[in-house]
Design a protein with these regions (language model features):
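N-terminal core-binding DNA-recognition domain of tyrosine recombinases/integrases
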Residues: 24-39, 48-141, 173
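Short, charged phosphate-coordinating catalytic segments
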Residues: 119-123, 190-214
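Basic, Lys/Arg- and aromatic-enriched nucleic-acid-binding interface segment
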Residues: 164-197
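Conserved tyrosine-mediated DNA breakage-rejoining catalytic core shared by Y-recombinases
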Residues: 202-246
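Active-site/catalytic core of tyrosine-dependent DNA strand-transfer enzymes
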Residues: 241-295
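Short, basic (Lys/Arg/His-rich) helix/loop patches that form interaction surfaces
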Residues: 284-323
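Catalytic-site neighborhood detector that most strongly recognizes the C-terminal catalytic loop/helix
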Residues: 325, 329-350
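C-terminal secondary-structure termini that scaffold catalytic or DNA-interacting sites
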Residues: 353-365
Length: 365
């Protein structure tokens, strides 16, 4: 990795010669130019470094994989998963081995790199183990869209994953224990907008807020002083409640002398960096302080899950929730929705009450 005026550039070097490995490095640069988030590029760099080390251990190169038959290719990539699962990718003693989902995610990144290689015309054929699949989805107005994907029949079995959420009553307790209005506004906006923490910390008070309509905008910028940025180089917006807007205005008035000295809505209100843009590390430190005071564990991502579940219970369509969260596919949104067994029984009771006569059972008794 190389830093250039706070920008990160990832590239690969040969262990012995120190020469740059061209194609993997070009792939990471392609991701950077495509406005992929730095964290995503970093994960891609690690995934590819693990795979390249695996190839070295097997005394193979990238071109060798294309020469393999189907069964050989399949064994090669499943062996990579087993190698990852055993913690062989790390030089440190792993106290906690990677789960199946993490191992699969590394391999999916490897497959994306192979696809990039093929698009660069380095190979006239594709990997034999990847098959084309199609998924049909509908947007909020019913228009169908066909998604083409590559699938691999060798991934490790994944458990059904549902991310952690937080309940409304716990959010209320956290708000009551906040040390200042900035922290209260930050929690409220996370809960009411569903924005990622990087998106919210990038909000500029003079450009990204419609004070008349009470709308907060997410604008993609890759030069924010605090390193915050929107994930998918996208533009989104969210309306906040009148009550939250009132607290927002109270916060701006309360700290206006600090806020007007720079561009960002959220700033450090005390300490050595007072008046400087608030960073993600500061948010997590604030949440840890609240956890010590209340015993309630919270994270920005848990508040995104709360947003999604609260809207689902209020009757929002899945497509609308997905768009509000900035997801590129519905599958990701579905993982946010914590549907309980009690809810399933409740909606089943309501269904049968509306449709008791659907099978004509009364006539059978």
């Amino acid at each position: 990795m190389q830093m250039d005026k706070q920008e990160k550039f990832y590239f690969f070097r040969e262990n012995e010669s120190g020469d740059i490995v061209y194609l993997p490095s070009k792939y990471l640069m392609h991701k950077k130019r495509s406005k992929i988030s730095p964290n995503t590029i970093r994960r891609s760099a690690f995934a590819l470094s693990y795979y390249l080390n695996f190839l070295d251990e097997k005394q193979l190169c990238l071109d060798d994989i294309y020469q393999m038959k189907y069964i050989e290719q399949h064994e090669h990539f499943t062996d990579f998963l087993i190698w990852l699962k055993a913690g062989m990718h790390s030089r440190e003693d792993y106290l906690k081995l990677p789960n199946n989902e993490t191992c699969n995610a590394y391999l999916k990144e490897v497959f994306r790199f192979y696809t990039f290689m093929e698009q660069e015309n380095k190979h006239s054929e594709s990997l034999k183990v990847l098959s084309d699949t199609q998924m049909i989805v509908r947007n909020s107005i019913g228009i169908r869209k066909v998604l083409n994907r590559k699938s691999f029949r060798g991934y490790l079995k994944e458990k059904g994953h549902q991310g952690k959420t937080i309940e409304q009553d716990k959010i209320v307790v956290l708000l009551q224990e906040c040390a200042n209005s900035r922290d209260q506004v930050l929690l409220l906006l996370l809960a009411e907008t569903g924005f990622r923490i990087g998106e919210l910390l990038g909000v500029r008070y003079a450009e990204d807020i419609d004070y008349e309509k009470h709308i907060i905008y997410v604008n993609f910028r890759d030069d924010n002083e605090n390193g915050a940025r929107a994930k998918n180089a996208e533009l989104r917006r969210a309306k906040i409640s009148d009550a939250t807007f009132d607290i927002l205005m109270f916060y701006i008035e309360d700290y206006k002398e600090l806020i007007i000295g720079q561009e960002y809505l959220f700033i450090n209100v005390s300490g050595d960096y007072v008046g400087k843009p608030f960073k993600g590390s500061g948010v997590y430190a604030m949440l840890r302080r609240l956890e010590r005071k209340t015993g309630i564990k919270a994270s920005p991502h848990m508040l995104r899950h709360y947003f999604a579940n609260a809207r689902r219970k209020d009757g929002w369509k899945l497509e609308m929730i997905s768009q509000a969260l900035g997801h590129r596919n519905i599958e990701t949104t579905m993982k946010y929705l914590n549907i309980t067994e009690d809810e399933l029984i409740e909606v089943s009771d309501a269904f049968y009450n509306r449709h008791q006569a659907m099978y004509g059972v009364q006539n059978l008794l």
